[in-house]
């Protein structure tokens, strides 16, 4: 029983132990599982973070855009860090010491300032003489733009007599190929030499001038420079004789002037469109300067106020500026030429000014001149002046390395030397013909040692400065065989490559220069032709406008003058008195004389009478050719003012057409209180074959006299004429020629003499007044029918004979030509009408006047 109980207790204890063990195992498993889960989470988090960092690092590394594995990313990162460490070490080694460099200046800025202070510039030259970099400080020193020298041979800018020496210096490392290692290139290779360099000019045809300069530099090793073409000299020196690093060496030098310049042009313009405003008096003294001027010119406003602007201008620009200022004073506004302004730092800066004159608002007097000055670069100035000279200048060449720079506008000359060398490492190498063609122009000099610092030579071929597009294309076509042939023909040895180069290039430039000069002359002639044609069109337009204005003024004067003459005729009609006219006969004789008379710019000339008729007639000659052609209008504009028995001494001028009328000159023949005598000698033949002439003269007392012949002259005294003014029109274009001629021919059986005198009897004036009334009626009819006026005396008939004294003055309202026959036929019809009228009057005995 006891055994049974104990056995039961033992079994219960064993079961209890097994359960506890199982529970313990379960608890341990749960703990391990929790630990694994926690560990897995932490591992996953770490891996995720590592992947994110690798991905971010891969995105920052340069290279392909493809996905890289972790090891590649880490490897490139290590390489980048190593390279960065090396560059940092080199920068620290080349860093300028802070004890003599200001902290606010970068290395590039400090280097530029030092070059300007030392009158020097940087120059990087390959061993074959090709220039790969030049700093901008060359512009104020030698007046070259950096683009003029980049990618050209240095031998183009050095006298020919110094080529061999410079070539030996640049190729000196070839002779030391054993000792010249990359380590040597980094340390003990400093080189100094002196030579002459060509100065730049605006006109390439000017006489070349050379400046004496000093080169101080050393050879630099370029790691990734592609193999050079050596400008066509591969056949001269075998490739196997050259060291492997020859093509990767360039000569970097600082070029300084032997004679320093105290005043230089500002070489760099940070912002070419910078401008400032100033105000000047009429004497060109500063009155105002705005706040933008001090950073540009260096002067504060109080430093320039009251001083003349001419104190700051370059002496070579004074003449052009004076002409511009004269233009300003004449037109009130304008634009100046390019000129140099002296800054406070003793540098010349190029400016262009727009100015205008301001006037007082009350009295309109000029007060002062407002100027807006704009900063311009030397490249713009040179391009503009070369265009004025008819020289085509191509734009600065953009190298291939710049085209690879996306969005960059900086040229190779605006970067540092280090960047230029790096760009040259990746830039494509020009072909042999292209590289050789750029060394095309050379100028022969007599003796480079004639002057120590500056040398002027007289040559027929101008030096090479810049190449236009068509020149470079023509020169690139030159082959290497032509270069070697020309070098042999000129006697240059093959062992000296660069000595054969100038001769080759001189021939090439001689061939391309006539084409360039011809194109430049053709462009200049075309430009001049366009300017002349434009100026001609402007002058013609002004002439047409002035002619139109003159025509309108003449029409107005004609209208006013016609109205005044009508009133004058009405007033003078009441004062006319007529006397009797007696015709007497005399012996016949021939009087033939031509007497020219000058009468206020007009010529009055007597002509011979035809068929024995004594006639005095002053009229416009229809044999003179006039310039304009309107004969019909002229014939219808003629008008005869006829008197009854005596001469009516007044002239009416009126035109019904709208043609251009000339200005009139008035000739006044005054009548004294005594009787005015008009003598008409008449010597008429008995037969039809003899002719007689009436000679008309004017005396100083303004009397009209006909010179006496050998026969009897009878005198008749007529009543005084109230109006003694004879108005003779004259044209403003040409002097009017008036000739006396007979209107019609009639045979005279008896000589006749007409004399007009003045009567004083008051009783006869009443009868003459009645005659005036009857005589004016046909005259008024003729006046309304014919606008052009003639002054004629009355014709008196005695039996079947007739005599006439006609004084006519033609009004040249239109310059025209007309035939004599048509004019005489028109006058003959008028004379016949007058004959009928006078015959009726003479038959009336109450109208007769006793002698």
Curated annotation (Swiss-Prot):
Residues 447-468, 495-508 have a biased composition (Polar residues). Residues 516-566 are annotated as: Implicated in the circadian rhythmicity. Pfam families: HLH, PAS, PAS_11. GO terms for molecular function: DNA binding; DNA-binding transcription factor activity, RNA polymerase II-specific; E-box binding; protein dimerization activity. It is found in: Cytoplasm; Nucleus; Cytoplasm, Cytosol. Transmembrane segments: none annotated. Residues 34-84 form the bHLH domain. There is a cross-link at residues 67, 847 (Glycyl lysine isopeptide (Lys-Gly) (interchain with G-Cter in SUMO1)). PROSITE patterns: BHLH (PS50888), PAS (PS50112). GO terms for biological process: circadian regulation of gene expression; DNA damage response; protein acetylation; response to redox state. The record marks 84 as: Important for interaction with BMAL1. Keywords: Activator, Biological rhythms, Cytoplasm, DNA damage, DNA-binding, Isopeptide bond, Nucleus, Phosphoprotein, Repeat, Transcription, Transcription regulation, Ubl conjugation. Residues 420-508, 627-655, 817-851 are annotated as: Disordered. Residues 107-177, 262-332 form the PAS domain. The modification Phosphothreonine is found at residues 451, 461. InterPro entries: bHLH_dom, CLOCK-like, HLH_DNA-bd_sf, Nuc_translocat, PAC, PAS, PAS-like_dom_sf, PAS_fold. Ubiquitinated, leading to its proteasomal degradation. O-glycosylated; contains O-GlcNAc. O-glycosylation by OGT prevents protein degradation by inhibiting ubiquitination. It also stabilizes the CLOCK-BMAL1 heterodimer thereby increasing CLOCK-BMAL1-mediated transcriptional activation of PER1/2/3 and CRY1/2. A motif (Nuclear localization signal) lies at residues 32-47. GO terms for cellular component: CLOCK-BMAL transcription complex; cytosol; nucleus. Residues 336-379 form the PAC domain. The record marks 39, 43, 47 as: Interaction with E-box DNA. SUPFAM superfamilies: HLH, helix-loop-helix DNA-binding domain, PYP-like sensor domain (PAS domain). Transcriptional activator which forms a core component of the circadian clock. The circadian clock, an internal time-keeping system, regulates various physiological processes through the generation of approximately 24 hour circadian rhythms in gene expression, which are translated into rhythms in metabolism and behavior. It is derived from the Latin roots 'circa' (about) and 'diem' (day) and acts as an important regulator of a wide array of physiological functions including metabolism, sleep, body temperature, blood pressure, endocrine, immune, cardiovascular, and renal function. Component of the circadian clock oscillator which includes the CRY proteins, CLOCK or NPAS2, BMAL1 or BMAL2, CSNK1D and/or CSNK1E, TIMELESS and the PER proteins. Forms a heterodimer with BMAL1. The CLOCK-BMAL1 heterodimer is required for E-box-dependent transactivation, for CLOCK nuclear translocation and degradation, and for phosphorylation of both CLOCK and BMAL1. Interaction with PER and CRY proteins requires translocation to the nucleus. Interaction of the CLOCK-BMAL1 heterodimer with PER or CRY inhibits transcription activation. This is Circadian locomoter output cycles protein kaput. It comes from Tyto alba (Barn owl). The lineage of its organism: Eukaryota, Metazoa, Chordata, Craniata, Vertebrata. The gene is CLOCK.
């Amino acid at each position: 029983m006891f055994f049974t109980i104990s056995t039961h207790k033992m079994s219960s204890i064993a079961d209890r132990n097994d359960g506890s063990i199982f529970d313990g195992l379960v608890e341990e498993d749960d703990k391990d599982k929790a630990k694994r889960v926690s560990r897995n989470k932490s591992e996953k988090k770490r891996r995720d973070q590592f992947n994110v960092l690798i991905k971010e690092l891969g995105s920052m590394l340069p290279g392909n855009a493809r996905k890289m594995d972790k090891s590649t990313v880490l490897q490139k990162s290590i390489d980048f860090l190593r390279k960065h460490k090396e560059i940092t070490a080199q920068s620290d080694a080349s860093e300028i010491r802070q004890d003599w460099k200001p902290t606010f200046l970068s290395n590039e800025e400090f280097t530029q300032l030092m070059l300007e202070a030392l009158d020097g510039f940087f120059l990087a030259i390959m061993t074959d003489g090709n220039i790969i970099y030049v700093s901008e400080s060359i512009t104020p020193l030698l007046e070259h733009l950096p683009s003029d020298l980049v990618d050209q041979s240095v031998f183009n800018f050095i006298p020919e007599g110094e080529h061999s020496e410079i070539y030996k210096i640049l190729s000196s490392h070839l002779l030391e190929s054993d000792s010249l290692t990359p380590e040597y290139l980094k340390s003990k290779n400093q080189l100094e030499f002196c030579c002459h360099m060509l100065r730049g000019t605006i006109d390439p045809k000017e006489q070349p001038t050379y400046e004496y300069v000093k080169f101080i530099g050393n050879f630099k090793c370029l790691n990734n420079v592609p193999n050079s073409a050596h400008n066509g000299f591969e056949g001269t020196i075998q490739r196997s004789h050259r060291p492997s690093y020859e093509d990767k060496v360039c000569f970097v030098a600082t070029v300084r002037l032997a004679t320093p310049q105290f005043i230089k042009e500002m070489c760099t313009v940070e912002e070419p469109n910078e401008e400032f405003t100033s105000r000047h008096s009429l004497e060109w003294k500063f009155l105002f300067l705005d706040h933008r001027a001090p950073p540009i010119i260096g002067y504060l406003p109080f430093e320039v106020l009251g001083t003349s602007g001419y104190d700051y201008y370059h002496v070579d620009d004074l003449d052009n500026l004076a002409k511009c200022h004269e233009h300003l004073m004449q037109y009130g506004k304008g634009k100046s030429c390019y000129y140099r302004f002296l800054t406070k730092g003793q540098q010349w800066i190029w400016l262009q000014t727009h100015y205008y004159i301001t006037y007082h608002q009350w009295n309109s007097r000029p007060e002062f001149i407002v100027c807006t000055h704009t900063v311009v670069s030397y490249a713009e100035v040179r391009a503009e002046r070369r265009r004025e000279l008819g020289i085509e200048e191509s734009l600065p060449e953009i190298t291939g390395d710049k085209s690879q720079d996306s969005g960059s506008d900086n040229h190779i000359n605006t970067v540092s030397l280090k960047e230029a060398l790096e760009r040259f490492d990746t830039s494509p190498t020009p072909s042999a013909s292209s590289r050789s063609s750029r060394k095309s122009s050379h100028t022969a000099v007599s003796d480079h040692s004639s002057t120590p610092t500056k040398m002027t030579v007289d040559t027929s071929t101008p030096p090479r400065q810049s190449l236009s597009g068509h020149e470079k294309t023509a020169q690139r076509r030159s082959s290497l065989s032509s270069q070697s042939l020309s070098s042999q023909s000129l006697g240059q040895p093959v062992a000296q490559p660069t000595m054969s180069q100038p001769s080759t290039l001189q021939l090439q430039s001689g061939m391309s220069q006539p084409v360039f000069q011809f194109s430049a002359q053709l462009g200049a002639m075309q430009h001049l032709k366009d300017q002349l044609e434009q100026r001609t069109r402007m002058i013609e337009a002004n002439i047409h406008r002035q002619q139109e204005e003159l025509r309108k003024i003449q029409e107005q004067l004609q209208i006013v003058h016609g109205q005044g003459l009508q009133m004058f005729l009405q007033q003078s009609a009441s004062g006319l008195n007529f006397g009797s006219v007696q015709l007497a006969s005399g012996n016949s004789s021939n009087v033939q004389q031509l007497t020219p008379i000058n009468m206020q710019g007009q010529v009055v000339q007597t002509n011979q009478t035809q068929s024995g008729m004594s006639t005095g007639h002053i009229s416009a000659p229809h044999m003179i050719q006039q310039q304009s052609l309107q004969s019909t209008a002229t014939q219808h504009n003629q008008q005869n003012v006829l008197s009854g028995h005596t001469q009516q001494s007044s002239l009416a001028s009126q035109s019904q057409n709208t043609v251009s009328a000339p200005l009139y000159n008035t000739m006044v023949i005054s009548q004294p209180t005594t009787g005015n005598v008009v003598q008409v000698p008449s010597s008429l033949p008995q037969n039809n074959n003899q002719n007689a002439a009436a000679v008309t003269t004017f005396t100083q007392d303004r009397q009209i006299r006909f010179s006496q012949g050998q026969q009897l002259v009878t005198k008749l005294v007529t009543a005084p004429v109230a109006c003694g003014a004879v108005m003779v029109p004259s044209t403003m274009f040409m002097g009017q020629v008036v000739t006396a001629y007979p209107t019609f021919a009639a045979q005279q059986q008896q000589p006749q003499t007409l004399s007009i005198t003045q009567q004083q009897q008051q009783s006869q004036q009443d009868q003459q007044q009645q005659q005036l009334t009857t005589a004016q009626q046909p005259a008024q009819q003729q006046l309304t029918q014919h606008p052009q006026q003639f002054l004629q005396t009355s014709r008196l008939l005695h039996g079947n004979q007739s005599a006439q004294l006609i004084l006519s003055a033609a009004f040249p309202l239109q310059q025209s030509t007309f035939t004599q026959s048509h004019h005489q036929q028109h006058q003959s019809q008028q004379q016949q009408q007058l004959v009928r009228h006078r015959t009726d009057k003479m038959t009336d005995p109450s109208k007769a006047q006793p002698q």
